[in-house]
């Protein structure tokens, strides 16, 4: 009976996940504008910072755990806020697991994992080239506009500031006009200008 309850709970979860994925695909197809929503709390481990591969033994072991223990692991792009503040658009890559799945799949945090807290964010689907060769051909400012340009415009219009690292989750890959592309759900954590000034 207990096993049956577990299976029912998991099937219910899968149903909700599929429903969420379908909504994301519909948004990607329509390229619906950005919207405000709290991001999902997740734990990630990076394998690349800018052009530098991160290869510490403990980090590689944790990446292996993420990839092989969680069927719901997500490939992410991360843009650190501190890099943006220095005028750089540095893209980091990693693997992420939703907070709720860490215990479910007996996974642990360590010095190589980072907790990405739930907070108010501006979200939107963006399309970028799927190959590193093509991505590396873009100027930083062009890439910034491609990935978060609509987010920044919305923030400007609504008097908001960036309030943390920006995260993008790959939601789908496709070939369009003979070229591989990726659709990412980009989340930019925000705070109002007024709140920022108080802090």
How should these model regions be labeled?
Residues 2-199:
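A solvent-exposed interaction/effector surface
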């Amino acid at each position: 009976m207990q096993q049956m309850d577990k299976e029912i709970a998991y099937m219910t979860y899968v149903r909700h996940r599929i429903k969420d994925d379908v909504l994301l695909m519909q948004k990607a197809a329509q390229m619906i504008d950005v919207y405000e929503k709290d991001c999902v709390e997740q734990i990630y481990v990076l394998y690349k910072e800018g052009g530098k591969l991160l290869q510490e033994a403990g980090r590689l072991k944790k990446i292996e755990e993420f990839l092989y223990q969680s069927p719901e692991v997500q490939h992410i792009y991360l843009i650190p806020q501190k890099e943006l503040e220095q005028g750089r658009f540095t893209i980091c890559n990693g693997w992420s697991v939703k907070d709720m799945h860490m215990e479910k799949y007996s996974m642990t945090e360590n010095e190589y994992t980072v907790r990405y807290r739930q907070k108010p964010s501006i979200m939107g689907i963006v399309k970028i080239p799927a190959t590193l060769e093509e991505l590396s051909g873009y100027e930083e400012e062009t890439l910034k506009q491609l990935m978060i340009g609509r987010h920044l415009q919305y923030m400007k219009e609504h008097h908001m500031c960036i309030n943390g690292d920006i995260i993008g989750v790959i939601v789908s890959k496709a070939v369009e006009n003979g070229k591989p592309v990726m659709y990412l759900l980009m989340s930019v954590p925000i705070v109002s200008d007024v709140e920022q000034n108080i802090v």
